[in-house]
Amino acid sequence: MFITPKLQSPSRNFPQIFTNLVPFCLFGWLASINSLEAQTIALWGKPTCAVEPSDRTLKDNLRKTNNSAYPALIAKHKDQITECRSQDPIKTQALWLRLYAKDTKPEVLADVLDRIVNRGYNTVFVDVFYDGQILLPVSDNPTPWRSLTAEAVKAGKVAADFDLWAEVIRQGRDRGLKVYGRSFAMDFGYSYSQIPDRASVLAVNGRGETSISKSQLNPNANAVTNGKASNLEPNEADRVFIDPYNSQARSDFAGAIASLLKRQPDGILFDYLRYPLTKGLANNVKDLWIYGEAARNALLASMPDAGTKQLMAIYLAQGEIPPKAIAMLQETQQKITGMTQVRSKNPAFAAKLSEKFLWQLAVNHAYQGVLDFANVAIASINLTVNSNKNLGSKPAIGAVFSLNGNAPFWNRFPLSMERHPMTYALCDDGKCVANEVIKVINASPKAVVCPVLAGTWGQSWRGHPSLETQMQAIRAVAPQINCISHFSFEWVEPESDQERKAGL
């Protein structure tokens, strides 16, 4: 992982600089100071609406000493960011953030949020449900998933009722930050699969495999290693995908979202609205994840007539339509209706035509499962907000997706969902990233599009150009884009992230 070098301030380096420069002229000393300042600026980059260096240092010192002037400086920066963003073309500049148990310490979370504001961000996307754990307090977690703070609570280091999700929303708003939750959708996490009565909830393909038994190296693993596809992971062994048609899965997920919404975030983003990754294109019905009991029953129930239903059942079971199945179906239909059936003169040809028709029905059914699950999430939000007037206005709703991993149904998401495409293409000038953004805009011209960029400020990272370069490229071809997010705090502030990961 790329680690930004830790720089000491020029004032702390002054004694050494002064000693080394005694033999040299004043011009040389000034040149050295200018060089050091340039290095600091290059590593910080040029984020728009950033807090001035002197104010950053002052705020850090005030926080560490618990000075009474700290809240006033926070309020000042809040007003400055609000004013600056209102005049900047990018009205919403967001940063992705994952919290850890150490963030339950008030001073740690305050430092994280101060760092985010310092770089000119006015929105933060917080991971609230991922890898089988949820950002709810142990004492108020009605979901099947483990609380993020469970281990810390068990160790006696965090109170069972500590609500980190509510706290980051409160502290974020104190600083003028809008706070969104980012939730995995169809990936429920490995721990969910270990619940005895949830085995039937998992997505299953035509070979009886779940995403656990099918776990494999990601076909794009090399791309992950060299930075070409930062949204993908080397393997999906811990990714447990559910059958989107399963009522238990829908109920569990709706309940989790309702609990998270009680903390009144500004928005909620849904990621992993897809099935498990597979090698290459699916070209056989048994490759599709529609063999769970709920998905299969829903597919058969949607068939237009009994004959098509019978053929689909054969197709699902055998992965093909044998010619003799056509003849058998005609005989069955004749017995049922009492009408003489016109026999096909070429059963093999009729079987192939039937396969093409049934294949399209099966593929559409798979797509529809994802779209229906997205609508379940939206319905859960609407129901929660409408049934509880204390929650205020309805939060923004968005879908996070990869243009490849979610192909080809991301453009079918409801228009009410913001588009947050992970535009992670690699090129020196950022134009390839801009091209991906244009692709999403053209496919969803009426939807809000807020691209997700990978990288860091002021420098390239594993082939990703600087965030400044990518944003300039996007603005050049899509000036209507006024919302952008950066993945992630871990890459922008690597030292802080590593220190917080270390635990309490």
Locations of the language-model features?
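Mature N-terminal, pre-catalytic/accessory segment of carbohydrate-active enzymes
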Residues: 2, 34-111, 115-121, 126
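Aromatic- and glycine-enriched glycan-recognition loops and surfaces
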Residues: 103-119, 148-175, 369-372
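Polysaccharide-binding and catalytic clefts of secreted carbohydrate-active enzymes
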Residues: 214-385, 396, 403-413
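Substrate-binding cleft of secreted/luminal carbohydrate-active enzymes
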Residues: 402, 420-504
